[in-house]
C-alpha cells in the first residue's frame, strides 16, 4: 500500500571492456580514470575490433585503425568517429597540452560518447558520404577533361608547325668551287613565323667553313700533283741531256793548256753539270745561291722573253778567251776532269771551287749547266730597254716555286738546243 517500485536499472558495461584490448602498447595510462570514464559513458567501451563488417551490419569503422566496432566516440568539432584506443593514442590522459583534431585540425581536440547510432543518423551519414563521393567523381572527370583538351591543343600546334613551305633558294658560292643552292624553309604557327634551323641556319654557319676547308685540301692536292708533274718533266729533261752528254764527275784542279795545245781542239759535245736533285733541289739552290742584286723579271714590259737568272744562260766566248760568268756570286768556274780543262776568270785566277756544296736541306745541287761555245752560241734576245730590278726576289709560295722551276726547265732546254759544246781556243 503506498509502496512504489523503483525505476529501470541501467545495463552496465562489462568489466573486460573497461581495459584496452592490446591494439597499442599504452604505458602511461591511468587505468582507474579510464574505467571511470567508460562507466560514466563519457568514453566508448574498449570493444574488440573486427576486421570485416560482414559479421554485423550495424558496426562502425574507425578511420584511424580501420577496424569495425559496435559504437565509437564522436569528435565535438567535426563529429568524426574514433575508437577509444585510438583516442588514447592521440591524446594521452596524463598530459594537459591541447591536441589538434586529426580530421579537421581544430585545436583542443575533444570527444564525446553518444552510444550506438540510430537509423536516422546512419541514413544522414550515408547521404553525406554519397554527396562527398559524387563531388570527388565530378572533380576527377573535370581533371580528365582538362587533360584531354590540353593534349588536343598540343597536337594541333604540332600539326600546324609541321606545315613547312619552301620560300626561296639561297645560293652559296665559295672560291674554287661550284655554286650550289640550299632551299630555306619557313613554318608559320598562329601569328609567329620561325625559320627552320636545320636547312637554313646550320647551312649558313657550317657549310661555308666546311667547303673552305674542302677547297683548301683540294688546292693542296692539286699543288702536290703539279709538283709531281714538274718533277717528272725535270727528270725527263735531265735524262735526255745525259744520253748524249755523259755526266762528268767531281771537279779536280788541272793546269791550263798552252796555246799550242788549244789549237787542235775542235768543238766537242757540250759538257754539263746536271742538277743533283729535282724540283725541290732547284728551288732550294735558287733561293740559296741567287745574288742580292738579281731579279727574275724585266722592268720593261715590252719584251716577251723571260729572264730568270744570269748564271742560267750560256755565255759567248769572244776573242779566243773564256767569258766571265757575271751573275755568279763568286765568278764560278766550271771544270770537267775528263777533259782536263778549266774555265778561267777575267783576273787570270784559276779556281777549282764547286758551284755549291749542297742545299741546306740535304739535297745536293751541282748548279746549272755551264755551256760555252767558240762564237757559235747565239745570245739571248734581250730587249733594248732591258733593266734588272735592284730588289732581291725569293720565291715564297708553292705556286711561285713551281713557276720558277718550270722556268728553269725551259731555260735549261733552251741552252741545250743552242749549245754545241765546251771547247778551248
Curated annotation (Swiss-Prot):
Any one of the GO CC terms: cytoplasm
GO-annotated biological processes: protein ubiquitination; regulation of seed growth
Reactions performed catalytically: S-ubiquitinyl-[E2 ubiquitin-conjugating enzyme]-L-cysteine + [acceptor protein]-L-lysine = [E2 ubiquitin-conjugating enzyme]-L-cysteine + N(6)-ubiquitinyl-[acceptor protein]-L-lysine
Pathway field: Protein modification; protein ubiquitination
Localization terms from the record: Cytoplasm
EC numbers on record: 2.3.2.27
Tissue specificity as recorded in UniProt: Expressed in roots, shoots, leaves, inflorescence meristems, stamens, pistils, spikelet hulls and endosperms 4 days after fertilization.
GO molecular function: ubiquitin protein ligase activity; zinc ion binding
Zinc finger motifs (RING-type), residue ranges: 62-105
InterPro entries referenced in this protein's UniProt entry, alphabetically: Sip5/DA2, Znf_RING
SUPFAM superfamilies: RING/U-box (SSF57850)
Enzyme class: transferase
Keywords noted in UniProt: Cytoplasm, Developmental protein, Metal-binding, Transferase, Ubl conjugation pathway, Zinc, Zinc-finger
Primary role: E3 ubiquitin-protein ligase involved in the regulation of grain size. May limit grain width and weight by restricting cell proliferation of the spikelet hull. Possesses E3 ubiquitin-protein ligase activity in vitro.
Extra remark: Plants silencing GW2 produce grains with increased width, resulting in enhanced grain weight, whereas overexpression of GW2 decreases grain size and weight. The naturally occurring WY3 allele of GW2, which encodes a truncated version of the protein with a 310-amino acid deletion, increases the number of cells of the spikelet hull, resulting in a wider spikelet hull, and subsequently accelerates the grain milk filling rate, resulting in increased grain width, weight and yield.
Protein name (Swiss-Prot/TrEMBL): E3 ubiquitin-protein ligase GW2
Taxonomic path: Eukaryota, Viridiplantae, Streptophyta, Embryophyta, Tracheophyta
Gene: GW2
